[in-house]
């Protein structure tokens, strides 16, 4: 069924760039001067340079002993038309030791008109003539997608998934409870969320997914969103060749085996040498490399060791026929000098797209990490492997890598690991790279001789590999400092115009002082939280830092709360650390509520005092108080990590009887002095794995009726409000743009 998507009619303002094409055709009478020509015949080549654009230097091949070379080589530059762009042309002579400059010339690009194409002669040393063909055109098809709407692939997925879910819900609920499902318009959008929490979150989420799969709930979900540790399980599951034909049960058996080994086994000298040498290839190609790259390799070797070449794009085959929920992953873009609690841009990843909803900018997954300028790729690299993204999504653990491996001599002294993570800020992992220089491993300017080039590159590689090896296999500064550990990629928004930016809910009024003040009356009272969330990123910085989203709050609600996704029911699983098993479990959920309110996104009121009234439970349900008024507000079923009924029951309604059955379930999660479920435990013996896995498997199955009842209510809500999260086109026309002045924090 076709429908009108109002978000397609919101214009995301962006400036078009120019593509300047230069064809180096030929030169005649190339000379080194009378005396120079007597000693040697020139070996000419041409360098082109425009300082105002990335990937600014280009060069032709050289010809040996040729004074009339014909190159006929084409080069492209992406330019900002508002800059003073000047082409510098240098005629060079290739030599064995150091190349020689034979002459230079300049050409102002502004002298050309858009659509113009012409040949331009340049004279060097009053003798040599070089002919360049130049053309200038508008880049009308950028590589970034500028839109507030979901991409067409996700829209197609949603429609196919609704068809599948309609039948699955009828099967799950039975004919009586599903009688409101007349068409796909009545199908509610269900999302499953997993929090961060290291391997604890990953193992717990594995039990959750097994229960959801076997109960049929997973077949009724449209999305599954993860953060940090949960993304590691999602990556393991979705990259597995047998999923979704086979369920999580067999895959979880493999996972249990993989995480039972000591992580130090990944750091044998031979393996480390292989890691570092593979990263040299990335660095030498011009991409930034940080410790997060290495951490991603270690996570990949642990969890997806037989599929290290997998990419995010390759997961599309799992969801193209809408056979399973669309996986959504996340990280943060942060600034070096600002706390991530004050400023952070949420970056979302799916097999279809990567981007930032705040700016309405998205790209195909294989372009993430490539060099962009004004929305156009100026240098494309191979798609980053999935394990690199796994390192980025869980990069908080690369900060305290010595604690993860247990190589620190002080690991049992002073603060606990959870307390250390609590105190980490983006400043600990983001180096303030003021130079912002490119990372290409380049030799001296003009070096062309192959032997000299190989020797230069070999020396560079040997030095870099040696430093990394020494850092990893010894208790060096790399283990004792936290600087520069964030993931780093080329800034895909470099050169864009951010005079206009967009709230996540673009159709809501951001200019009301009263409404803003009302939102500050939230359960989490720290006034600094999210204070600068409306600020734009730095479009002049060549690279951006991407870190673990758990450093701001530990639940991936921003992915699911995008109104374009129209989610009716959210089933969230929180594996976050708590001071003790009896501590209130709502800290992260309250932060998510505050973030949602400050972004004017509908969110049910979270009452933290329900813990005082009802005590610790396996899950809590939060609904809109007035569904008739709060038509766009989702219902949330919030599962927490708690061992309550599992101690008595081995399955829902089936009591434990034997001593062994009771002992295996008699354990604490956060109060155990041995800390087997610590956030920083990266080795799970089989018993610890089974305990945590089976606990969350039980807790989920024990509350399946709660989930089913919420689905039935969501069907009714959807039936009563078929145009949920939609707006009239007249409203869209009236609100095409939101200027930054309306998005800045109101002053009192």
UniProtKB/Swiss-Prot annotation:
SMART domains: C2 (SM00239), PLAc (SM00022). Keywords: Calcium, Cytoplasm, Fatty acid biosynthesis, Fatty acid metabolism, Glycerol metabolism, Golgi apparatus, Hydrolase, Isopeptide bond, Leukotriene biosynthesis, Lipid biosynthesis, Lipid degradation, Lipid metabolism, Lipid-binding, Membrane, Metal-binding, Nucleus, Phospholipid degradation, Phospholipid metabolism, Phosphoprotein, Prostaglandin biosynthesis, Prostaglandin metabolism, Ubl conjugation. Residues 140-739 form the PLA2c domain. Activated by cytosolic calcium, which is necessary for binding to membrane lipids. Activated by phosphorylation in response to mitogenic stimuli. Stimulated by agonists such as ATP and thrombin. It is found in: Cytoplasm; Golgi apparatus membrane; Nucleus envelope. Residues 1-178 are annotated as: Phospholipid binding. GO terms for molecular function: calcium ion binding; calcium-dependent phospholipase A2 activity; calcium-dependent phospholipid binding; calcium-independent phospholipase A2 activity; ceramide 1-phosphate binding; lysophospholipase activity; O-acyltransferase activity; phosphatidylinositol-3-phosphate binding. Residues 427-458 are annotated as: Disordered. The active site is at residues 228, 548. InterPro entries: Acyl_Trfase/lysoPLipase, C2_cPLA2, C2_dom, C2_domain_sf, LysoPLipase_cat_dom. The modification Phosphoserine is found at residues 2, 434-435, 437, 505, 515, 726, 728. Ca(2+) 2 binds at residues 40, 43, 93-95. Its EC number is 3.1.1.4, 3.1.1.5. The keyword S-adenosyl-L-methionine does not apply. Has primarily calcium-dependent phospholipase and lysophospholipase activities, with a major role in membrane lipid remodeling and biosynthesis of lipid mediators of the inflammatory response. Plays an important role in embryo implantation and parturition through its ability to trigger prostanoid production. Preferentially hydrolyzes the ester bond of the fatty acyl group attached at sn-2 position of phospholipids (phospholipase A2 activity). The N-terminal C2 domain associates with lipid membranes upon calcium binding. It modulates enzyme activity by presenting the active site to its substrate in response to elevations of cytosolic calcium. In the presence of phosphoinositides, regulates phospholipase A2 and lysophospholipase activities in a calcium-independent way. This is Cytosolic phospholipase A2.
């Amino acid at each position: 069924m076709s429908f009108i998507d109002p978000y397609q009619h919101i214009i995301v303002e962006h400036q078009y760039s120019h593509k300047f094409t230069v064809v180096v055709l030929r030169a005649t009478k190339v000379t080194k001067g009378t005396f120079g020509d007597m000693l040697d015949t020139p070996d000419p080549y041409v360098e082109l340079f425009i300082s105002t654009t990335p990937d600014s230097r280009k060069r032709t091949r050289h010809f040996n002993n040729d004074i009339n070379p014909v190159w006929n080589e084409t080069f492209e530059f992406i330019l900002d038309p508002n800059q003073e762009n000047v082409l510098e042309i240098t005629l060079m002579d290739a030599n064995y030791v150091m190349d020689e400059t034979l002459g230079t010339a300049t050409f102002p690009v502004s002298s050309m008109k858009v659509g113009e194409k012409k040949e331009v002669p340049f004279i060097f040393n009053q003798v040599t003539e070089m002919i360049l063909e130049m053309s200038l055109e508008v880049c009308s098809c950028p590589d970034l997608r500028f839109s507030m709407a979901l991409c067409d692939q996700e829209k197609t997925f949603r429609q196919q998934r609704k068809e599948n879910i309609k039948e699955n819900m009828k099967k799950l609920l039975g004919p009586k409870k599903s009688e409101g499902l007349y068409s796909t318009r009545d199908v509610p959008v269900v999302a499953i969320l997993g929090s961060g929490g290291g391997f604890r979150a990953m193992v717990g989420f594995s039990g959750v997914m097994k229960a959801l799969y076997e109960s049929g709930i997973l077949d009724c979900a449209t999305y599954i969103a993860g953060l940090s540790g949960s993304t590691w399980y999602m990556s393991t599951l979705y990259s597995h060749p047998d999923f979704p034909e086979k369920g999580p049960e067999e895959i979880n058996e493999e996972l249990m085996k993989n995480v039972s080994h000591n992580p130090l086994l990944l750091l044998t000298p031979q393996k480390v040498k292989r890691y570092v040498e593979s990263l040299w290839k990335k660095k030498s190609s011009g991409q930034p490399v940080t410790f997060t790259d290495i951490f991603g390799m270690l996570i990949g070797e642990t969890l997806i060791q037989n599929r290290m070449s997998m990419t995010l794009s390759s997961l599309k085959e799992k969801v193209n026929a809408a056979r399973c929920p669309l996986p959504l992953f996340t990280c943060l873009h942060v600034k070096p000098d600002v706390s991530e609690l004050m400023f952070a841009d949420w970056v979302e990843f799916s097999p279809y797209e990567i981007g930032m909803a705040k700016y309405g900018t998205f790209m195909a997954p294989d372009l993430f990490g490539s060099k962009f300028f004004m929305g156009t790729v100026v240098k494309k690299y191979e798609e980053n492997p999935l394990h690199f993204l796994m390192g980025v999504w869980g990069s908080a653990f690369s900060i305290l890598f010595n604690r993860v491996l247990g190589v620190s001599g002080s690991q049992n002294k002073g603060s606990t690991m959870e307390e250390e993570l609590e105190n980490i800020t983006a400043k600990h992992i983001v180096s303030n790279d003021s130079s912002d220089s490119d990372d290409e491993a380049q030799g001296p300017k003009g070096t062309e001789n192959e032997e000299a080039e190989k020797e230069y590159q070999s020396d560079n590689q040997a030095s870099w590999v040696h430093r990394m090896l020494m850092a990893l296999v010894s208790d060096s500064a790399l283990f004792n400092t936290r600087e520069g550990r964030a993931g780093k990629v080329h800034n895909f928004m470099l050169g864009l115009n951010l005079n206009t930016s967009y709230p996540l809910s673009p159709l809501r009024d951001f200019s009301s002082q009263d409404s803003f003040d009302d939102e500050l009356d939230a359960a989490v009272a720290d006034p600094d939280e999210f204070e600068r969330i409306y600020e734009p990123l730095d479009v002049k910085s060549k690279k951006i830092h991407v870190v673990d989203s758990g450093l701001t709050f530990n639940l991936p609600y921003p992915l699911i709360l995008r109104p374009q996704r129209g989610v009716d029911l959210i089933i969230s699983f929180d594996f976050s650390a708590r001071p003790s098993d009896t501590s209130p479990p709502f800290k992260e959920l309250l932060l998510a509520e505050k973030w949602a309110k400050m972004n004017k996104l509908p969110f049910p009121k979270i009452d933290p005092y329900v813990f005082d009234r009802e005590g610790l439970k396996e899950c809590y349900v939060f609904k809109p108080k007035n569904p008739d008024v709060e038509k766009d507000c989702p219902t949330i079923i919030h599962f927490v990590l708690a061992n309550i009924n599992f101690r008595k029951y081995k399955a829902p309604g089936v009591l434990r009887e034997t001593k062994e059955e009771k002992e295996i379930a008699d354990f604490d999660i956060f109060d155990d002095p041995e800390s087997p479920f610590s956030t920083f435990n990266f080795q799970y013996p089989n018993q610890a794995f089974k305990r945590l896995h089976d606990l969350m498997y039980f807790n989920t199955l024990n509350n399946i009726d709660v989930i089913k009842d919420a689905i039935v209510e969501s069907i009714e809500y959807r039936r009563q409000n078929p145009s949920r999260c939609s707006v009239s086109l007249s409203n869209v026309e009236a609100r095409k743009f939101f200027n930054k002045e309306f998005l800045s924090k109101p002053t009192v």
